[in-house]
Regions:
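Short, surface-exposed patches at the edges or C-terminal ends of soluble domains, predominantly
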Residues: 1-191
Length: 191
């Protein structure tokens, strides 16, 4: 019975499931003929890990790139032709990489970043830069506390949650708001 059919997302952290609100935003942007671009910048991982902690951090960064890639494919499927996903690689096309990095103020210090850009009809492109490590994920860095055993090693970082949809959709909605926020400061007034 077609009415009872449904998809069950068994991927880690439900990365292939997007909320109804996200679907509506992407469909509205497509209806407005707005251009949505996602630019993925990958930082350097740097060869062989120094220790277990560094190896775990590298594994988390790779996992975040994979999860973000899967989520962006879903966004592209929903948004259709209005959504474009671009993966920038400094080694494959250095000139295009440099040009995009300058356009979006990306630096090597930003490591893995996702740029969410929107160009509405008749308006200039607006963008927001998101860090995959701090904006799209909840990571328990474990601190430098030993594991409890005598001579124990420091606890390793753990990827607790991937919040890619929340951050990306929030950035999209924020880019659609027109005008600059205004703050009024009153001096000498009692409340």
């Amino acid at each position: 019975r077609p009415a009872l059919r449904g998809l069950i997302d068994l991927t880690p952290q439900r990365v292939n499931t997007v909320s109804l609100a996200t679907k509506e935003v992407l469909r509205d942007l497509r209806a407005e003929e707005a251009e949505v671009e996602f630019h993925v910048f990958r930082g350097e991982f740097g060869g062989v890990p120094r220790d277990d902690r560094h190896a775990q951090e590298m594994a988390i960064r790779r996992k975040l790139l994979d999860l973000t890639g899967m989520l962006l494919r879903r966004y592209a499927a929903i948004g259709g032709e209005s959504v474009k996903v671009v993966h920038h690689d400094a080694y494959q096309d250095p000139a295009a990489y440099r040009e995009a990095a300058q356009a979006f103020t990306y630096t090597a210090a930003d490591t893995e970043s996702l740029i969410v850009a929107v160009r509405q009809k008749g308006k200039e492109r607006r963008f927001r830069k998101l860090s995959m490590v701090s904006d799209l994920a909840v990571i328990d860095m474990g601190g430098n506390t030993p594991t409890g055993a005598p001579g124990g090693r420091p606890a390793l970082p753990i990827l607790k949650d991937f919040q890619g949809e929340k951050a990306i959709s929030s950035a999209l909605k924020g880019l659609l708001v027109q005008g600059n926020p205004v703050v009024y400061v009153l001096k000498g007034q009692s409340v």
